[in-house]
Amino acid sequence: MKKIVLMAMMIATGYSATAQDEIETTVAADFVSSYIWRGLDCGSVAVQPTLGIGYKGLSLSAWGSYGLTNSDDVKEFDLTLAYTTGGFNIGITDYWFSAGLDPDARYFKYDAHGTNHVFEANIGYDFGPLSLQWFTNFAGNDGLNKNGKRAYSSYMEVAVPFRLATVDWTATAGAVPFATTSYGTNGFAVTNLSLKATKEIKVTDTFSIPVFGQVVGNPCSQNAYLVFGFTLQP
């Protein structure tokens, strides 16, 4: 606690430029034509703000999604604590949704059988040419398996980034290994095949806007999506 307080004082007063340089802050917002997550349709046009801080591989970030055109879209607010060293990463995310077990959508209600929170742990490794990630829900409003018990819903993903024709691309394949109502699967199922392209549009000499398009297919649900979006970040 003393170290945290001292760090905050150093930032506020500017006593240590070196310490400030080591602390990374992220403030950004994505605007998307539809909210597609792991091959699932989670809503229509949305703004998705991000606020984060990182120090020597440890990061704490807040992320949200809020529908702009459909009042029925579920609001989301997530907190993620993560650590990265080299290519290895590990983290815990607290997802909160405005729809769930609590009809009053209370954020600070954490009852095991009455909360709108979902807690997920993840582990992964970035090999450079590709990255592997595994995610598992371990508490909160998780889905159910075929026996009607907590499914510990999991998702695994491989992503391959590459550059082609001055555009940054990412090809992704994701699957759900076990039956769960969270993803609507009865067993192992491929739920996410996507290809995303991102290009920065120069506005001024010091400001650019990343614009992206993404094709997403979900073989399990037999659905496909085309998403457009852009990012604002100072």
Language-model features: where?
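Outer-membrane beta-barrel initiation region
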Residues: Q20-I53
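Outer membrane beta-barrel transmembrane domains
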Residues: D168-V203
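Outer-membrane beta-barrel "beta-signal"
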Residues: V160, L195-A197, I201, Q222-P234
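Short loop/turn motifs that connect adjacent beta-strands in outer-membrane beta-barrel proteins
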Residues: Q20-E24, G91, V160-A171, T198-V211
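Cleavable N-terminal export/targeting peptides
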Residues: M1-E24
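Transmembrane beta-strand segments that form the barrel wall of outer-membrane beta-barrel proteins
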Residues: A28-Y35, L58-L68, I90-S98, A105-Y107, ...
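Residues that define the transmembrane beta-barrel architecture of outer-membrane proteins
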Residues: I23-T25, G43-V47, D73-F77, T115-A121, ...
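Detector for outer-membrane/organellar transmembrane beta-barrel domains
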Residues: K109-T180, Q233
